[in-house]
Each structure stands twice: as C-alpha cells, then as structure tokens.
Amino acid sequence: MTGITEDGIEIDREFAASPEAVFAAWTTPESFSRWFGGREVTVPLDGLDYRAEAGRPWSAMMVLPDGNTIDWAGEFLEVDPPSRLVMTLTDRPAVAERAVLTVELTPTAAGTRLVMTQQTPGFTDEQRLGTIAGWQTFLDVLSEIAEG
C-alpha cells in the first residue's frame, strides 16, 4: 500500500534490481547524491556526510534549481544489508525533532519490493501526500541507478 498511515506515510514499490543493488543505491554516498532530491535538485558530494553505519549522524545539502539550499540531517539507527535501513531525517537541523524513516527490502521474482515508512509528526494530510509525491520522484531516480 502506498498512502497515508496513522502517523505518517508508506510507500510500497517494486524494483527490477536485486536487494543488494537497491540497498547500495540507498547507502553509497555517490549514489545517494544522485537520487536524493530527484532530477531537479543536486546534492554535491562536498556537502554530503553520509556513511551508513548504525549510530552515525549524516548530513546533506540540497541545491535547488533557483540556487537556494536545504540542509538535511539525521542519524543512521539500523543498517542491516541488504534488507533493512532505519534512519532519522529532518530539513530543519537546528530543531531536535527528527522523523524516523524505515526502508525494508524483500527479494521478489522480479527483483525487490521496497516498503518505506516515514513518520510525519504535525503534518496535514495534504503535506503527507506531498511527501509521498516527493519521495516517488526521488525513487524514480534511485530505480534507474539500482537497475543500472
């Protein structure tokens, strides 16, 4: 199911790539910088601190088409290749509250099923739908990377 949940969002999606390839696209800095933000946004490697190790903080700077930037921050909570990644994230690093994002990857006959959940405290349903749409554009690019 892709949609709104009681406390956030869920995206359920298939990839024509192995769980190892999808997991690598999530956890390799060079791949993450290519897909995080979709096609219209860049994430320069020199603005990215992203090593997927449990307990390690991460940060990224997105450069929008108009030149403005968004700073992202979080922490890796669980890193279990190639099946599970749990991390926190926020686009307001000065605020202590972080959303928890969980990615679960399951092998299928066609490749991999991704089930991603994100807590969205304080979001309206309209904001949650916008978050789903945004993640889908990110995952379109991740799919191209993972599927090679």
Give names to the regions the model predicted.
Residues 1-42:
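Hydrophobic ligand-binding cavity/cleft-lining segments
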Residues 19-34, 77, 81-82, 134-145:
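K/E-rich alpha-helical interaction surfaces of small helical-bundle regulatory domains
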